[in-house]
Structure formats: structure tokens, C-alpha cells
Amino acid sequence: MSDLDDFVSAEPPWYTGQGDSGRTTFGRHGDVAKTDVRVTAYAECDEANAAVSVAMAAGGLPIGVTSTLASVQNDMFDLIADLSVPLDAPEPATARIRESHLTRLERAVDHFAQEAADLSGFVLPGGTVAAALLYQARAVVRRAERAVWAAVEAYPTAVNPLAARYLNRLSALLFVLARGANVEHGDVRWVPEASARAMAQNENGVDARAATPDVDGVG
């Protein structure tokens, strides 16, 4: 049987109550607590993939970007399948994250970075709706990366570290894509202590807008 049979089965029921004790059958890791770091890593990656899907569904992205993200979503299922099977399992996993997965992401980062403006400082997550959702997806992916590293540390012979490295590269890709989604309007730049400066200037009768974050190319 496939490692993802429980995920894709069309057979009812959709609930069994078997996990009501706080334990679950996690792939070929067997019966584990739902609070196990391996389950947490699996769940965080599932959420990360969903966050990518939201960014895609919102629209406003070029076909080249959506095509790349569609490939990423398939990779994320490879990653989830990988996490479901220990590295030292006697039978091979349905899929494993390999160096080739990382290479594809690195090439995508290099490609899309050429479409974004030069980075001259820290930028805030925002701008267009497409950019904001890509920034949000990046934050979720970074959390998933930390969760996978925790699983690698706890089970070094069972959890594939390439899965964590893939998520690291994916967060870089999402950052580059978010900046690309803002290319027409510019990045939202970080202004250190902007709120405090605005308050002080307002108290002194100065237009507070002069101290608020602005957008490159707009103000």
C-alpha cells in the first residue's frame, strides 16, 4: 500500500475516532503521539502547501510563477511522503526529497531574482495582494522548516535533512516571488522606529506622513 493511502482514499468514513486518544498512525513510523515532533513537522508542511495554494488562487501572478508554484506543490507532497517513512525503513518510500529538488529551486530563485529590483534594505511584507500572500506563505514555510529541523534533531537516522533544506530554499523563492509581485509598485520599505518618530513629529506639529514607511517608486 502507498504511504499516502490514508490521505487519498475515497472510502468512507472520513472520521474514525481512532485518534481521539491523542495518538495516530503516522505512515511507517507506526503509532505515535499527535504531539510527536515528526507529526508536527508533517502538519506544518501540509499548512505550508496550503498557504502556497492560497497565493496561487488569489490571482495576479504571471503564468511562469504559477507554473513554478504548481511544481512546488507537487514537491511538497513528495516531502510529506518522505517524512512519513523513516530513512532506515526496510521498504523504499513513495518519494524522497533529493538534491535535484534543491537544485531546481535554486535555479528558480536565480531566474526570478532577475525580475525584482535591487534590494537596498529591509522590506516589509505587503504591497499588492499577491505579494502579501507570498510573504505569508514564506513565513509559514519558515515555520515548517524549523519543525522539520526539530524532527531531524530528535530522529537523526529517520528524518531526511534534505526536507528541511528544501523548505529553506522554498522560503527564498517565495521572498523573491513576493518582491517580483511588487515590481510595478515597489517594495514597502522598513523605516526603523517609524511609529515613534511619527508620534514625536506629530507632537511637534510636523506632518506624520513624512515618518511612515513608504513604497519604492511611489513616495
Language-model-derived ranges and their functions:
Residues M1-G219:
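Phosphate/pyrophosphate-binding loop motifs in nucleotide- or prenyl diphosphate-using proteins
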